[in-house]
Design a protein with these regions (language model features):
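Short recognition helix of helix-turn-helix/winged-helix DNA-binding domains
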Residues: 1-59, 65-72
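Short, Lys/Arg-rich nucleic-acid/phosphate-binding segment
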Residues: 77-80
Length: 80
């Protein structure tokens, strides 16, 4: 993806030092919170993140599940 937003992502210590999360899930958390700060919620799709990090949607879903299982995020799925 050519366009990268110019904002800071802050990852709280509780997330950074959680040994149940892999490093990429922690990085994704920072991206999620940065996007949520922009509009009050994270509007991006799984495909958006897959393109951003050059991984599959399945990988993004795995990272999101890690974050949800540890209660760092709550997901609502919207279908078009």
């Amino acid at each position: 993806m050519n366009e990268h937003r110019g904002y800071y992502a802050i990852i709280p210590a509780i997330v950074r030092y959680d040994n149940h999360l892999n490093g990429n899930a922690k990085l994704l958390y920072g991206e999620l919170t940065a996007l949520a700060n922009e509009k009050g919620y994270c509007w991006a799709t799984n495909q958006y993140f897959a393109n951003l990090y050059n991984v599959s949607k399945r990988t993004i879903i795995s990272w999101l599940k890690q974050l949800e299982e540890r209660n760092y995020i709550k997901m609502q799925i919207f279908y078009k």
